[in-house]
């Protein structure tokens, strides 16, 4: 009888495929709560982009050069917007997030240059407004995604105070690294939300398309969690200074 032995890392990675992945199910902005984009039950009142991710799956590194990396697979802009004042904080709550899916949490914003309901994911130019990666430890360490779980599967992001009024798309993303030690193993979970930003200043970001954010061999994408390490290079562009 042939016997196979798997490492702890391999077992964790395999187990993760059976875990339920999540999506942003609730958006709180300026005292209002909006429904997120449920992949199985679209809600016309949601400012979240509806994508073809009914498997609650991910965008893999081989697709990072396609529009799927912007707002998930074949994402479509909704007519609704969440209203938020520049400088205030938005709370994004996921319906669930697996404990095995350690990794960074990143937030971007892109101007729609008009109404966001007619925007396409591939045409948006984003700037990064927040990022958080490794917090402490290694093998696998404590990560931003773990902090999200500790906070009731929620994450807060502050809209830049100097952002010019207008309509924008907020891109919120977790990159799960539990399989990222293997080529094409990282898992990106981008979520997009239409915003109408009020108040603020006069800064309008120029940004870049999401297809230029990451490459499959970036050190923060091809990264082995299950080893000793002192730091983690957060992928993507630098945080926008305004």
UniProtKB/Swiss-Prot annotation:
Cross-referenced CDD domains: LPMO_AA9
Sites where the protein binds O2: 178, 187
Sequence positions that bind Cu(2+): 21, 101, 189
Cystine residue pairs: 71-192, 112-116
Enzymatic class: oxidoreductase
Keywords for this protein: Carbohydrate metabolism, Cellulose degradation, Copper, Disulfide bond, Metal-binding, Monooxygenase, Oxidoreductase, Polysaccharide degradation, Secreted, Signal
Signal peptide: 1-20
Catalysed reactions, as listed in the record: [(1->4)-beta-D-glucosyl]n+m + reduced acceptor + O2 = 4-dehydro-beta-D-glucosyl-[(1->4)-beta-D-glucosyl]n-1 + [(1->4)-beta-D-glucosyl]m + acceptor + H2O
Keyword Flavoprotein: no
Family: Belongs to the polysaccharide monooxygenase AA9 family.
Protein's recorded name: AA9 family lytic polysaccharide monooxygenase F
Gene: LPMO9F
């Amino acid at each position: 009888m042939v016997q196979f032995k798997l490492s702890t890392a391999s077992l964790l990675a395999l187990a993760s495929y059976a875990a339920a992945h999540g999506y942003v199910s609730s958006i709180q902005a300026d005292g209002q709560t909006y429904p997120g984009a449920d992949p199985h039950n679209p809600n016309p009142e949601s400012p979240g982009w509806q994508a073809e991710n009914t498997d609650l799956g991910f965008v893999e590194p081989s697709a990072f050069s396609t529009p799927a990396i912007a707002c998930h697979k074949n994402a479509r802009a909704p007519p609704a917007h969440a209203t938020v004042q520049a400088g205030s904080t938005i709370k994004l709550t996921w319906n669930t997030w697996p404990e095995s899916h350690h990794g960074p949490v990143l937030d971007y914003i892109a101007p729609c240059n008009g109404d966001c309901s007619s925007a396409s994911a591939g045409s948006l130019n984003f700037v990064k407004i927040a990022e958080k990666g490794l917090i402490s430890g290694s093998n696998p360490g404590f990560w931003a995604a773990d902090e999200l779980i500790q906070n009731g599967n929620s994450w807060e992001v502050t809209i830049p105070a100097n952002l010019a009024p207008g309509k924008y798309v907020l891109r919120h993303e977790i990159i799960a690294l539990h399989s990222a030690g293997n080529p094409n193993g990282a898992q990106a979970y981008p979520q997009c939300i239409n915003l109408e930003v009020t108040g603020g200043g006069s800064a309008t970001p120029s940004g870049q398309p999401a297809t230029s954010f990451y490459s499959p061999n970036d050190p923060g994408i091809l990264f082995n969690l299950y080893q000793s390490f002192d730091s983690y290079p957060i992928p993507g562009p630098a945080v926008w200074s305004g």
